[in-house]
Amino acid sequence: GKWISTGISKGGQTTMFYRATYPDDVDVSVSYVAPLNRAIEDGRHEKFLAKQVGTKAERKVVKQAMQEFMKRKKDLMPLFHEYCTKHDYHFYLPEEDIYDYCVLEYPFALWQWGTPVSTIPSLDDDDNTWFSNLMNVAEPDYFRYPNKYMPFDVQAIKELGYYGYSLKPIKKWTSLKSTKGYLKKIMLPDSLRHYDFDATLYKRTVKFLKKEDP
C-alpha cells in the first residue's frame, strides 16, 4: 500500500522535516500549514499581516480594532484583571503588558483561525462587547505560566523559530518599547532562556525542498 505523511502547523513542519530527513519513508507528504521559520522571530509574518492577508479594507478594520482595544485599555483593564484572576492566570510580565501582547496577537489569531472580520465590534459597541471579542480571539491563556506549550516554545527558540510582533499599529498607546525577544521573556522561565537559535534544520529543509519540490 501507499503511505502518506501529513499534518497542520507543527505537524506540517514535522511533515517537511520528515520528508527532508527520510525522503524514501513515505510516498506522499501533505502539509496543510507548515511555517518554515528562519529565526526565533522570522520577520515575514508582520509584513504579511500588514500588507497581504485579506483585503485592504479588512486589514484596515483589524488595525482599527487593535487601536480601539488600546484606546479602551484603561476601562478594559479591570475586566482583564478580573478575568485573569478568575482563571488563576499567572504571567512573567505585568498584566498591563500582557494585555498589550493580547492585542498584538489579535490579528495573527484572527486570521489564523479564519475568524470573520465582520465579528469585530463597531466603535459604538460597549466595553463588555469589545472585551469579549478580545478574549474570544486572543485569550491570555496563551501567555500564562505554567504553559502547556512550553516544550514547543523551547523547540521554537532552539530550531523551529516563530513569528514576531510589530508595534506600529499600537505604538501611540502602548508602553512597550520593543517586542524583540518576547518568546523567551513571556513563555519561558529563566532557566530555559539561554538557548540560541540554530538555523541548521531550516537551511537543510529549504535546500531539500528547493531541489526536490521547486
Where do the protein language model's features map onto the residues?
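C-terminal subdomain of alpha/beta-hydrolase-fold enzymes, centered on the catalytic histidine
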Residues: 104-214
